[in-house]
Amino acid sequence: MEPSNDVALDIIVTNVVSVFRTRCHLNLRTIGLEGTNVIYKPEVGKVLMKLRKPRITASIWSSGKIICTGATSEEEAKLGARRLARCLQKMGFKVRFSDFKVVNVLAVCSMPFQIRLIEFTKNNRPIASYEPELHPAASYRIKNLRSTVQVFSTGNITVTGPNVQSVASAVEEIYPLLFECRKTLS
């Protein structure tokens, strides 16, 4: 049986991590006192700020570097980052939204079959590893896409990569390898 080309796999993006700079120094104490939905952590030297729409959490450092997590698309990450910059501007900081980039994307996908992990790692030995004592998934690294795929025996996979395109390409690349190691129903 050949892996059919018309199989539609739903790739669900669950987390997008992005970074941007404000190009100005930020007083964390002021943000902690005046901001809404903030947690000031002076021992770490950062402020956590949460937005409700889009639902993101931002780590704000006094240097002006901000890391946003929790978005479910690259567009939502950019919208949330711009909204965060606007909140800081309203507090009186001379914020300029710059150097925005998506640094990490986490997605999940479910294969329509179960997978024999030991056979999968034996077939793809140099780039696949499986340590059942440490973690229930096999790890498969795709260097040219800078992506890592975690393969579970149930057929569920989690993919981390630098952007949504590389995550989708990683799923396309690994599907034939998983198909040949699928469990047959008895």
UniProtKB/Swiss-Prot annotation:
First-listed, main subcellular location of the protein, grouped into a coarse class: cytoplasm
Lineage top rank: taxon: Eukaryota
GO biological process, one term: DNA-templated transcription initiation
GO molecular function, one term: general transcription initiation factor activity
Keyword Nucleus belongs to the record: yes
Record-annotated membrane-spanning stretches: none
Cellular localisation: Cytoplasm; Nucleus
Signal peptide positions (record): none
Family: Belongs to the TBP family.
Function: Part of a specialized transcription system that mediates the transcription of most ribosomal proteins through the 5'-TCT-3' motif which is a core promoter element at these genes. Seems to also mediate the transcription of NF1. Does not bind the TATA box. Members of the TBP family are differentially required to regulate transcription and development during early embryogenesis.
Name the UniProt record assigns to this protein: TATA box-binding protein-like 1
